[in-house]
Amino acid sequence: MSHADRYAALVDALERSVFDGPGHVPATTRQAARDHAARAVSGSTEPPQTSGVPDPWARHVDKVVRHAYTITDADIEALKAAGRSDDEIFETTVAAAVGAGVARLERALSLLKEGR
């Protein structure tokens, strides 16, 4: 059994829960965060605003995906000032992080499969 096969059901369950399950943020926003993360991991420099991530999430999603370690309290306060709740901020952050993580996992597994 390959690494990909071993964890496929778990990854699928995680993705369904994060991107399709109920939440404070519309599923379409969480899915757009996932899609932006996948493109960013593949090397795309497309701005998040053009990838379907609505404002005010676009900058935050891109930062989570590319430079999560640079997120500060001021970034979170800016989202709150834009009218976003703690629950919405958490869900969108998780969607971007899981999207990036799954995209990186899939890339790594494809490289292993290719024998690199």
Q: What is the predicted role of each segment?
A:
Residues 1-116:
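Hydrophobic alpha-helical segments
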